[in-house]
Each structure stands twice: as structure tokens, then as C-alpha cells.
Amino acid sequence: MYTLKFKIDEYNLNFTLKPSFVSSLYERKSPFHWIKIAGLYAKEISFKQINDFLEVYTNCNNKELILYESGLWDEKPSSRISKLSGSLKEQIKALSELFPGVRLSIAPHEFNCIFIAVILSKRTNYEVFVRKWMKNIWNNWQCNPSIIAKLKDIKNIGTSYQLIDLIKTMNDYLKINHLSKNEEEARRILMLCWGVGPKIADATLLFTRKAPWIVPCDVHLQRISRRLGWIDYKIRLPLKYFCLKYYCDECISKYGPCLKEEIKRLFPGFGGWIQTLTYLFGNTICKSINPKCKLCHSILREYCYKFSKNNNLR
């Protein structure tokens, strides 16, 4: 193996890999040290952040792949924040101070692995289960949809319904002849698969394409958008039925915007990065029940409806 050394600025390896589905292909060996254990170049790529440098130990001569998976291809947080103004700029700057150095780690060359990881993440603990499942799926079947679709069961890995559902979804996925380069078309094609809704399709595309404007809408994004006053409480999550029946413009004209369209409007060009920030925030501090308001940024508390209500400030 040889070593590559990158000078880094506004970058945090843990905050970049942890919220990305690319992390399902990695194992954290120690603080700020991740080793690839599944996918292309498994056991041949290792990232280690040491102060202001990212060291990459690898046999991979594809520098582009390394930049994608490390997240170093992505724009600096301050560059994105500079495009905002007013209260939104204040809030996103505060979020970025709580979770500094967040970039988007993507893997365009690992579509099958990422798609499988996203499917398995439905209503389960990602850190506890999905990581373990992905390691076993790679070791047994190299994330090959053709092999997985033919399995009668997957009990040697686990009995959770997510694993059973994976076989059904892979059967539909194999019927796809071509996945369009156009994100909206690709999204619709993926949603033709059993068990794949807007969130799964969008998350798969966000982490396999250079498209930071794609917005997977989860409960964290919805909750934080409401609490910070970005959206009205009536704004709905994207619905598979509507997403397949209508193109976005037509759906908005008939039923009004969904959360995805509102986030795209508020944060043009980088809604996926915003979703990543809110995932980190919602998973650790701004929880649905018993949020840890004392750990929150003072600026965010000023704007938060939940904090104001709990403290009789409004």
C-alpha cells in the first residue's frame, strides 16, 4: 500500500462518513480512522484524519474514487453558507458550528451496495444492524442483486423483515434495463421497485451521484424544519403515489409543495447537504422526545418553536 496525504480545511472525517450510506461499506477502527470492508477496493482503502491532514492508505490508483468516498470532492460548508442570507444563514451557520466539516461522501461506483444499504435501513438501527448486514451480504454475495434475488431466504444473516423485503426488491430491480442520468426519471424508475418510496430513491441517488441538490426527506428533516420555522406544519412528506403519477411541477400545482420541494427552494443546489446536517442534529440533539436543548446552539434555541413553547417564551 502507498500513502496519499491531503491538506484539509473545513473537513471532519467522522461527520462526513457517519451520516452517509457510504459508511455501510466502512468500519471505524478508532477515532478518525475508517477502513473499507465492502465494495470495490474492500480492505484496500483506509482513511485517517490527523489534525489538518487526511491520510489515505491504499492500493487504489483511482484518485477520483478516493475524493468521492472521503467527501473531499464536495464544496466547503462556508461556501454554501455564504449563499444564504438572513435567519437561514444564521441557523445553518449555527448547525455547521455544532457539526463542523460536514461534506457529502458519495460512491457512484457502488450503486448496488448503496441501494441495498438504503433499503435495509427502513425502521431499524443503522449503526447496530445495517452495518453488520452489509458486511455479511458483501462477504457472502458481493452485493450482487442477481444472486440475492434468487435466495429463498437470508436467515444465515438474520430474520428481520428488512432482509426478507430485500429479496423482493431485488427481483423488481433486476427488471430495470437502464437508470436514467436525469435524477427525476431515475427516481421514478427506482420507485417502481417493491418497497421503494421517495426517501429510499432519493437517498440512493444522493449518495451515488454528484447531486447535492437531491433531498431525501426523513423525520429528522421534517421535525427540524418545523421547529426552526422553515416550513408550515401542513407541509407533507413526498408520497410515492403522487411522485409516480405526477411530475413535480404538476403535483405542486394540484396539491401544493411537499417538504422536498420546500427544502430545494430554500437551499437551492445543496438541499442534500442540509438534510445531512439535520440528520446529525436530529439524531443526537434535536430528538422528537426529550430533545437535549441544553446542548443546542444558542442561536438555534432563539428560533426554535419547541424550545420557546417549553419555556413559555411564546
For each predicted feature, which ranges?
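HhH-family (HhH-GPD) DNA N-glycosylase catalytic core used in base-excision repair
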Residues: 1-314
